[in-house]
Structures are given as C-alpha cells and as structure tokens.
Amino acid sequence: DAQIVDVRGKLLFPGFIDAHTHMALEVSDTITADKFETGTKAELAGGTTCIVDYATQYKGESLREALNNWHKKADGQSSCDYAFHLALTDWNEEISRELEEIVQKETCSFKLYMTYDTMVDDETMYEILSRLKELGGIAGVHCENNGIIQARLKELEKTKGGRTDVSDYPWTRPKEAEAEAVARLLKIAKCVDTPVVVVHLSTAAGYREILRAREEGQTVYVETCPQYLLMDESKYSLPAEEARHYMIAPPLRKKKNQEVLWQALKEGRIQTIATDHCSFTKEQKMAGAEDFSKTPCGMPGAEERPALIWQFGVNGERITAEQMCIYLSENPAKLYKLYPWKGALIPGSDADIVVWNPDTEWTMTAENQQSACDYCPMEGTKICGRAEQVYLRGRLVAENGKILEEKSGVYVRHGVK
C-alpha cells in the first residue's frame, strides 16, 4: 500500500534546520512582522522542517516563565517543527538553580548578548559559561563591543548633529567591534575551559580571532548567514528608505569579507549556516527615519536560505551539495542535540525529507513569498534549483513554494537528557 514517489534526477536532503530565528519577537517598540504562523510557512516553503527560535528571558522572569511565553506564541501556530534556545538576560542564584532542570529537559542551548539592553557583562558571562559547563549546555553569543557602538553613536550626534544618514550605520558597528568581542568571549571561554558558539559571524577580523583560539586548542563552533555571504555594505548607500531594509546587526560588511567566509565554509571551518530571520515591514523600518539607531534591526531570510546557498554555494562551485547538507541540516542537528531524529535520513529519524530539483528555474520576489514581510532583500535573484517537495515526519507539507498543510509543527525538546 506504500505510496511511491519518483525522485529520479532529484537530490534528497534531510529536512533543513534553521537554528537562528526570531519569530514574534518584541523589539524596538514593535514586534517582528513574522509571527510563528507566517514565519514557519516561509521556512517550510524553502525546505526547512525545524527551527530553533530564541525564547527570551526578560528582566525579572524565571526561565520557565520565558519558555511559557514562547510556547504561547508558537504552540498550534507553527507549520514546521520548532525547538527553543533561551536568551539569558537576568542572572542570579535562583536562575542558576533553575537552569539545571531546563538544560536536562528542555533546551541545551542558550543565547548571550555582548551588546543591547539585554547584554551580560564579563563577570556574568564567566558565571553562566561555568554553570553551563557543569550542566552540559552550550552558549551561542552575539559578539559586538557595546562600548564602541555607543561611543560612535554619540560621536555621530556631535559631528553631524544627528543620525539620519543610513550610510553612517556600518561605521557605528565596525569590524573591530565584532573582532574584539569575539576575542574577549574566547578568552573568557578559555578560562572556563568550555566550547562556545559564535553566531552570525560577519567579518574576516572576527574569523581570525577564532582561528587563533583554535590554534591554542579551543573548541569554537561558528555560524554565519546568507546575508554576510552575499550582500555588502554598499546597500547602506541606497536611498534611505530602501537602505533601512538592510539594517541588521552585525551590519553588512565590505565585500572582501565574503570570500573569507566562503573559503571557511569550503574548508569546513564554519559549522552552520542559519538565517537570523527577524523580519519587519517597510512601514516598521520607517521608525528610524529621524534617527537610524531607532530602526528595528533585522531582515527576512527564512524561505530564501536553502535556495541561496544552493545557487551561490553549490552552483557557484564554492561548496558541494554534501557540504550544503552538513551546514543546513546535519551540523545544527548535532550541535543542538536534535540528531539523529533531525539532520539525517536513516531508520528511526523523523522522515523530514526535502526533494530538491536542481533544474527548476525561478526568480525570488516578495510577491511570491510566504513571509509577512513586504519586501525580499534578494528581490529579482534568479535561481536554478529549489525544494520541489517537503516532507515533515513523512507527510507532504509543501511543494514548489506552496504550503499544503499548515500548523502541523510540533515542539521538540532538546535537553541533554
């Protein structure tokens, strides 16, 4: 009685995993355009069958309260499977005690910020990394030096009388801010003697700090994103309204950084490619018209990631199809304890399958995307290859960008037990 699907001439991938998303995130006095309902449809359309979203513990909250808040946003709304990282912003003895149960039963992975209002200082970073080492968890860290960013924002106010020129944005978050924060994180991690994840690496300067630490024997996992591989800071010289669409943090960098990141992927020195999907509409992006520091930072990318890595990575002969599978599926599954249920096509795994047609020609447009965002950062990009069919736990749920079955995603625990 088995249904037979003819996939001759196609590639089969284990369902892709996007281990860096921000759905229904409240930030910059607004909330992301994509809630779990639309954001996970976008993921599914592109071939992603599981996301790991950042639940955030706000000041004064317990870790359980933070997770419950995210369950209210995600449960019953998600079209792909979903797990959570937990961003830690408030640290004390009570939270340290509570962490044990969370690491055992819910999530092995946590987020720390070195900038923003949610940042942790070096002492807190040391304490959290030490506790995670005890419990078997791991931290992914947003690496930018907050002092440099704040000083340059103030400097711009003094020298130019305001912050309206978006072309000044990358100057306020220079490559040195990333490199210094990466270096500092890795020194702290070395003192603790524990691995860490550097998320959304954007610069050659930051990468050099990682290589240096690895040469000294440290284990450092690295994530980058399609935007840092394919776009550059010239986007900030577009007319202001459009330039704000590309305001992300870390910002887009000089083009020369791209080949360093691609080479690192070719050599297997970067472990995962995620999206940092954090979408806002054109209207939401207008919030920074008088002061770009008030523009909500983030861009969409959920649906586009696999196709972009295929087109510019595999078709562009920078990486192989096998490496694409490793960076988009196998490695994130292994890193975040989702393997072998996710990230593999083996007996006993979840039967999350992407049937990839390498010959389908199509063009990326906002008009045809599932995201609630009303623009596509790669608008007009011509692609050869796409997720023709997407199976979630054995059920056909998407075909050629169209969603066939909504809201069938389930919550995936990935604690160490």
What are these regions (language model features)?
Residues G9, H20, E43, G47, ...:
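Divalent metal-coordination and catalytic microenvironments
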Residues E94-I273:
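Histidine/acidic residue-rich metal-binding segments in metalloenzymes
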Residues D29-A83, T89-C108, Y126-E134, E176, ...:
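Alpha-helical scaffold segments that flank or form the walls of functional sites
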Residues D1-P14, H414:
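Histidine-rich, glycine-flanked metal-binding segment
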Residues K10-E37:
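Di-metal (Zn2+ and/or Mg2+/Mn2+) metal-binding site signature of metallo-dependent hydrolases
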Residues D18-T21, T48-D53, S79, T159-P170:
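Gly-rich Lys/Arg/Thr-decorated short loops/hinges at beta-loop-alpha junctions or inter-strand turns
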Residues T164-D193, H245-Y246, K266-E267, Q271-I273, ...:
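His/Asp/Glu-enriched, well-ordered alpha-helical/loop segment
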Residues A287-D291, P347-R413:
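C-terminal cap of metal-dependent C-N hydrolases
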